C-alpha cells in the first residue's frame, strides 16, 4: 500500500486524524500567507512602485534640507541629490574647505542656495548646538538627514576598545544625532504647519522628513564592533519611537538601513552586487522613502538598496537577527577582517 493510500484510509477511519490534518493545513496557511504577502510587498517596493514625488516635502518651494556629515561619501551624495530635486541646503560637517567647495559646486550646478557650518561634532559642545539653532532657526526647513557617524578603526574586542574611540562613537552616533534632531525637528514642524495653512493648494499636503542612517551593524548584533553595533541599535528604537511621536505633525521619520557601501568609514573601495557606491545607494534611498523594502516588519525603517533588502529579508525570515548562527557568522567575518588589518599594520610599522 502506497503512502498516499495509507493516508486516505487513515482519514476515512479516524476523526482525530482528520482534525490533525486540518490543523496542519491551517497552521501552514497562516505561516505561508503572511510570508508571501511580505515578499510581494518587498518586490513591489523595490521594483514596481514609481519613485517618490518630493513635491510633498517642499522641493522647489524654497525649503531647506539639513545634511550632517555632508562633506564626503553618503552625506555628500544626499546633498547633491536633494539639490538636484530643488531643495536649498544646510551642510554641516567638520572640514570647512570641503564644505565651501561643495557649496560652490551645488549652487552653481543646481541654482539653489546652500549654507554651511563647520563644527567638530565629536566635541559634544553646547556652543556647537547653539550655533546650529541661532543660524538656522528662521529658515524654512522641511528635511533633516542625520548622516554623521563613526565606527571603529578596525574590528576590536569590546574589552580592548580604547575609551576615546568608545566615547566618540557614542557621542557622534547618538548624542549629536539626538541633539541636532531636537533643534531641527521643531523647525520642520513649524515649516510644515505654515505651508499647510498658507492656502496654497500645492502646499496643503506638505510633509516633513527626518532620515537617520542606520546600519546592518545595528540590525544584527556584531561581535568585534560591539560599541558601534550598540549605538546603531539604539538609533533603531529611537527613530521608530520618534516616528510614532511626529506622525500627528505630518513628519515622516525613517531609519535607513544599509549593508556595506563604498565609503571612508567602511574602508571598502570596490563596488559589487552587494556593495553599491554612495550615489547608487542614496538614489535608491530617495526613490523609496516611506516604503519598507527589505524591512517589512519594522515600522519607520527602510532597507532601500535591492540586494541589501533581499539579504535583510532572508535573515529575518529564515533565522532571525538574534539567532546564534547569525552571531557566529558575523564574529568569524569580522575576526578575519581584524586579522588582516593587524597584519597590515605590522607590515607598515616594519617598513617605517
Task: Pin down the residues of each PLM region.
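Catalytic loop of short-chain dehydrogenase/reductase
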Residues: 189-234, 239-240, 244-247, 259-261
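Canonical Rossmann dinucleotide-binding motif of NAD(H)/NADP(H)-dependent dehydrogenases/reductases
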Residues: 41-90, 94
Amino acid at each position: 500500500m502506497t503512502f498516499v493510500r495509507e493516508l486516505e484510509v487513515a482519514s476515512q477511519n479516524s476523526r482525530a486524524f482528520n482534525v490533525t490534518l486540518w490543523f496542519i493545513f491551517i497552521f501552514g496557511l497562516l505561516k505561508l500567507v503572511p510570508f508571501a504577502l511580505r515578499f510581494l510587498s518587498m518586490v513591489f517596493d523595490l521594483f514596481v512602485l514609481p519613485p517618490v514625488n518630493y513635491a510633498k516635502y517642499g522641493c522647489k518651494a524654497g525649503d531647506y534640507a539639513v545634511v550632517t556629515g555632508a562633506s564626503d561619501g553618503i552625506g555628500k551624495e544626499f546633498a547633491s541629490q536633494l539639490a538636484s530635486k530643488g531643495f536649498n541646503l544646510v551642510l554641516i560637517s567638520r572640514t570647512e574647505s570641503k564644505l565651501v567647495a561643495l557649496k560652490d559646486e551645488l549652487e552653481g550646478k543646481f541654482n539653489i542656495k546652500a549654507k554651511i557650518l563647520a563644527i567638530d561634532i565629536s566635541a559634544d559642545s553646547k556652543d556647537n548646538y547653539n550655533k546650529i539653532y541661532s543660524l538656522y532657526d528662521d529658515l524654512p526647513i522641511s528635511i533633516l538627514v542625520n548622516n554623521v557617524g563613526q565606527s571603529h578603526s578596525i574590528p576590536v574586542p569590546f574589552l580592548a576598545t580604547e575609551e576615546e574611540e568608545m566615547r566618540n562613537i557614542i557621542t557622534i552616533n547618538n548624542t549629536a544625532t539626538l541633539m541636532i534632531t531636537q533643534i531641527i525637528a521643531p523647525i520642520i514642524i513649524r515649516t510644515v504647519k505654515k505651508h499647510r495653512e498658507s492656502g496654497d493648494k500645492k502646499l496643503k499636503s506638505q510633509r516633513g522628513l527626518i532620515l537617520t542612517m542606520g546600519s546592518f551593524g545595528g540590525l544584527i548584533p556584531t561581535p568585534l564592533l560591539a560599541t558601534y553595533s550598540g549605538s546603531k541599535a539604539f538609533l533603531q528604537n529611537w527613530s521608530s519611537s520618534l516616528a510614532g511621536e511626529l506622525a500627528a505633525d505630518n513628519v515622516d521619520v525613517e531609519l535607513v538601513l544599509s549593508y556595506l557601501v563604498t565609503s571612508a568609514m567602511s574602508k571598502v573601495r570596490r563596488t559589487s552586487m552587494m556593495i553599491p557606491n554612495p550615489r547608487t545607494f542614496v538614489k535608491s534611498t530617495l526613490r523609496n522613502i516611506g516604503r519598507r523594502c527589505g524591512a517589512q516588519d519594522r515600522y519607520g525603517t527602510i532597507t532601500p538598496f535591492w540586494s541589501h533588502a533581499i539579504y535583510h529579508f532572508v535573515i529575518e525570515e529564515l533565522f532571525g537577527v538574534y539567532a546564534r548562527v547569525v552571531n557566529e557568522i558575523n564574529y568569524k567575518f569580522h575576526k578575519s577582517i581584524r586579522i588582516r588589518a593587524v597584519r597590515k599594520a605590522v607590515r607598515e610599522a616594519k617598513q617605517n
